[in-house]
From Swiss-Prot:
Gene giving rise to this polypeptide: Slc2a6
Renumbered ranges of motif Dileucine internalization motif: 5-6
Membrane-spanning parts: 37-57, 81-101, 116-136, 139-159, 172-192, 194-214, 274-294, 313-333, 338-358, 386-406, 426-446, 448-468
PANTHER family with a match to the protein in the record: PTHR48021, SOLUTE CARRIER FAMILY 2, FACILITATED GLUCOSE TRANSPORTER MEMBER 6
Residue ranges, Extracellular side: 58-80, 137-138, 193, 295-312, 359-385, 447
Its biological purpose: Probable sugar transporter that acts as a regulator of glycolysis in macrophages. Does not transport glucose.
Knockout mutant characteristics: Mild metabolic effects. Mice grow normally and glucose metabolism in male or female mice is normal. Minimal metabolic effects are observed: female mice display a minor decrease in fat accumulation when fed Western diet and have a lower respiratory exchange ratio when fed chow diet. Mice also exhibit a subtle phenotype in response to lipopolysaccharide administration, characterized by slight changes in the metabolome associated with glycolysis.
Compartment(s) of residence: Lysosome membrane
The organism of origin for this protein: Mus musculus (Mouse)
Segments on the Cytoplasmic face: 1-36, 102-115, 160-171, 215-273, 334-337, 407-425, 469-497
NCBIfam families documented for this protein: SP
Protein name: Solute carrier family 2, facilitated glucose transporter member 6
Highest taxon of source: Eukaryota
Keyword annotations from UniProtKB, A to Z: Glycoprotein, Lysosome, Membrane, Sugar transport, Transmembrane, Transmembrane helix, Transport
Amino acid sequence: MQEPLLRTEGLDYDTFPEVPATPGERERAGALKNRRVFLATFAAVLGNFSFGYALVYTSPVIPELKLSSDPALHLDKIQASWFGSVFTLGAAAGGLSAMLLNDLLGRKLSIMFSAVPSAIGYAIMAGARGLWMLLLGRMLTGFAGGLTAACIPVYVSEIAPPDVRGALGATPQLMAVFGSLSLYALGLLLPWRWLAVAGEGPVLIMILLLSFMPNSPRFLLSKSRDEEALQALTWLRADSEVHWEFEQIQDNVRRQSSRVSWAEAREPRVYRPVLIAVLMRFLQQLTGITPILVYLQTIFDNTSVVLPSQQDAAIVGAVRLLSVLIAAVTMDLAGRKVLLYVSASVMFAANLTLGLYVQFVPRPLTPNSTVEIVTLGDTAFNYLTLIPLLATMLFIMGYAMGWGPITWLLMSEVLPLRARGVASGLCVLVSWLTAFVLTNYFLLAVNAFGLQVPFFFFSAICLLSLLFTGCCVPETRGRSLEQIEAFFHTRRMSFRP
């Protein structure tokens, strides 16, 4: 009797006995299979590099333009506030557009499209001859940033296998931090116009690399492009044996082939994950991260640290990069919730310290200098002026270890596939509208009430974030996107039975 070409393998099927792979062989095989996923992820997160670079562009530029002799470019307090905050307004518009583009063009093409407003915005700022050009360029780069913030985490989560999704999910934040650090470093060397010119480079490289990368298999399946989806998954896994994973994804997509109706949106399986993702992005901004990053040098000038504010900003950027690297390594080991707890606790301590310092420690007559006072000698005061730098480093470290990267990752993990494109855009819209309000009114609040008031407010939000994590956020470590989505069909608060 002729043997079938394919048959089910049983316990007695030993025609081709297998020798168990050694740990080293398994590690090399896994690295080989993940190499293409890493390449596709790197190509995508170059958009986050540009986002991080553009976000803090004002940090070295505002002090320079405040001293500008050109009346068309000189900034007063109100203009500086708008120059710093209009980026977030553009980012909110980018998040709004992502609600349409994410599902219309797909994740990859939406990321590539973001390069257009980004490149134009940098070019306008580089050649700015008036405040309106600075604001327009800043808003365009913000629009690109909001679009990438909604599209890149979704793309990365949909192409990554579960065992490395936590580490790869941290790369958007990692590259955003690296972009900010690059801006701080270049700000020590280049004038503000050339900083805008330098921002064009990562955008062009991103377009070039993404042209050769596949689209998300889940998106392709949702558009009934099954053959392309299988080819994309096979390329990403560097393996022809992807049919089991492909069938899992295909079954899940087919069950959710239609859009979410308003009636379904009121069901817990839909609104619970969306609400968790939106509130996480809302609380993330209320911790104070965006105004602190945008006005970092201004904060250091007002707290009179020992080192020049430009060097302080670069040091903080380096600490932020190191912290995100730690989060990327530990996220799949410690889990998401542990890092969120640690992150919120550290940010609370840092914000409270900054508020108490501003409230009770007297300032010198001029920034970055010391004077003799009755209660404190010169040496003691010099040591005290390290507190704002150390506390800011602690805040950035806490944020970058948890609430920075994990909110991006969880947004893409918990959102249901049928609503993922629209809901991720909604998350970014809420996030950046919140950031706009905070950034626009931060300097006004400081001038009216003092620098300590915003820091006390941020510390209270960090306590609220701890409570929210414990009550509402599920642990998604090691779960496939299909398992996470199935979990929200239950009414349990944890994966544990």
